[in-house]
Amino acid sequence: MEITALQAWRAIPQTRDIVDYFRGIFDVIGVTIEETGEELTIALEAEQIRIDAGLPENPDFVVPLKWENVENMVSHAEDGQIDSHESWRIVSVLFTSLTQATLYNPIMASDIGRRISRVEDLAHVYLIAPDGHEATCHTLAYLKKQWLVIPGLYGKPKRTFRMTAEDSIEYQRRVFSAIKNNSFREWWRFSRWYKKWRKTVSVKH
């Protein structure tokens, strides 16, 4: 009998390094597997990552995966640790889904939110591999009071971001914290941090 994604991922060692790697990136996500039609819930708990069949009722976001992504995750985590190259491989899979989930938040999509953070309405974003090559990329476009996250590069950007996996994870943890707490103070703190962080990972045109 062929192994399922649920069985494969439940066999991954639940080390502190593995659990802490994902802490702050999400609380609960849904995962769909293209080839098998499986739907899974991935929930971060105090000491472990819980993996159940079926999609959660209120996921932070849903990630569509292929079977090769399932096998790669097993390979990345089989030694109980995630190195920089493995981190890049993981983030490159989550990259667009993470961006969509955070930018679709009402605060991030509002004109006020954009003005507070001084976010341009058209940007190109590159995820840089450990060897320095530009790998995954997408376009962020603000149109009719909503963000569009489009795989690939389109239009003439007003800003270009070039981020490592570590940069992307730091951003996700900061913005996810602001979304969870959802207070003026948290969003103000995020805005101040973002404007400083942006200078280290982007160029304005």
Where are these regions (language model features)?
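Feature captures hydrophobic
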Residues: 1-205
